[in-house]
Amino acid sequence: MKYSEAEKKLKTAGCYCIEDGSRHPLWYSPLTHKQFAMSYHRNEEIATGTKHQISKLSGVKL
């Protein structure tokens, strides 16, 4: 799965970007009330461990 595909799923679930950091954009999930980092490289594949971490923090199955 690419970051762009994950971003679409997260936006559909209500997650949104709260800050464009210098290294990674920070996102917020209203489902879990937690923040998590994404990547600016939208065309790259997400590593398996990173995908699981984003899924866990966001509450959205990727």
Which residues are covered by each model-predicted region?
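Basic nucleic-acid-binding interfaces
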Residues: 2-20, 28-62
